[in-house]
Curated annotation (Swiss-Prot):
InterPro entries: Aldolase_TIM, Methyltransferase_A, RlmN_N, RNA_MTrfase_RlmN, rRNA_lsu_MTrfase_RlmN/Cfr, rSAM. [4Fe-4S] cluster binds at residues 120, 124, 127. This is Probable dual-specificity RNA methyltransferase RlmN. CDD domains: Radical_SAM (cd01335).
Amino acid sequence: MNISLLEGKKVVLLGQNVAKLEKLAQEYGEPAFRGRQIHEWLYQKGVRKLEEISVLPKLWRTTLSDQGVCTGRLEEVKRLVANDGTIKLLLETSDRESIEAVGIPTNSRLTTCVSSQVGCSMGCRFCATGKGGFQRSLEVHEIVDQVLSIREAFDRRPSHIVFMGMGEPLLNIESVLESISCLNNDLGIGQRRITVSTVGVVNTLPQLAELALAKLGRVQFTLALSLHAPNQHLREMLVPSAKVYPIQDLLSDCRHYLDITGRRISFEYILLATVNDKVEHAEELADLISGFQSHVNLIAYNPIDEEDYQRPSLARINRFMTVLQSRGVAVSLRASRGLDQDAACGQLRHQHTRLD
């Protein structure tokens, strides 16, 4: 009998590594290779239901199902396909919460944008996710499933993973790091192709560095800090959490993170027309991050309902980039994908929730 079941804990197969699945099999009196078979069918074949793992003895499958063991796969409730090939999925959890995952294809790569929470509590003024409120953090299998679901939608393995969907990853550090371990070791996606984005949460950056080293052995994923403003006053207007986490304290923690991990930090900066996209803002930003081993990723705003912010003109975007480049800042502009299908973070869930 499975010890975990005797303790009354829910047993979800997705998110568990080979060793844990082998142990599970042995706790039921099955040989260890049964655990390896479950692992193969979960991660390579992408099976959704336990009864579909036909290589397992039928009696054991029935026993597992009767005792509440499940794969942990989520249900796809809606799919949007943009003209550029971007696919956004609305997935439903076992407790009927909705989360989003987005697949962004190019010729050579498939980037999957995953959510770490149901909703978000950070309240960034320009973001649709917070409009629907915060419900809870996601479990490991719910994060990993998003990658498998995008793989199914495109019939190819995602090459890159970005934790830039719904939620604040650093408010769910344990599950995020465990899911990174699973994506790396069980799905074969290299850490260097994984990015974790944060708006900044007090005391979490040093914790992230230390926990990542403990759980992953080494830190190779990229940390992306969603800065969005070059000074404290403007950041407080756009990112309410900045009121309790001053920008200089945030950057000090970034330096500490860099010292521990040795990994370059990427700064995310969403451009809002006439709000934070002026020449003086670009100059301030260059001053603010001088001395960092960093890269600035500019994001042209995707308009959402209920907010008056606008997307800057291409001329204003190019001017902002030129100022940064003239100051020696490594900068890129994220290509806007899925604009015709509400691909901005949180839009699909927000609309679905309002309809319900």
